[in-house]
Design a protein with these regions (language model features):
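Cross-family detector of peptidyl-prolyl cis-trans isomerase
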Residues: 2-139
């Protein structure tokens, strides 16, 4: 009986520690690092996220920042109005959290690049701070 209880306890602990790993499976082409933890509710698909961001090419050249524009940027998470790396990388953030996203070109601007500031096939780095969440009212 002792052996059975030990095995049950071991398996329970193994599941508890393995579950977060399984739930946060890596997304091909996207590396997420948490620079500062946030608090409260998580952003979900359909919510509006208000963020400050700075974006760099991998050579370190900054190409854009909401702080340079003097105001945060808002978008509907998962709505396809931003690059796919953002839709995937911002989902699950909490208010106050700062994430660094390293995004392969196929989840960014791909073969076309963007406006001369981002060359074709560019891997990008973003620091994104979640300032506020407006929850989606739909069920």
């Amino acid at each position: 009986m002792k052996t059975f209880l030990k095995r049950s306890l071991f398996l329970s602990l193994a599941l508890v520690f393995a579950l977060p790993i399984a739930l946060s499976a890596p997304i091909k082409g996207l590396k997420i690092s948490i620079i500062k933890k946030g608090k409260g509710a998580e952003v979900k698909k359909g919510d509006t996220a208000k963020v400050h961001y700075t974006g760099w090419l991998m050579n370190g050249k900054k190409f854009d920042s909401s702080k340079d524009h003097g105001q945060p940027f808002e978008f509907s998470v998962g709505g396809g109005r931003v690059i796919q790396g953002w839709d995937l990388g911002v989902e699950g953030m909490k208010v106050g959290e700062v994430r660094r996203l390293i995004i392969d070109s196929d989840l960014a601007y791909g073969k076309t690049g963007a406006g001369g500031a981002i060359p074709p096939n560019s891997k990008l780095k973003f620091d994104i701070e979640l300032l506020a969440i407006s929850k989606n009212a739909a069920p």
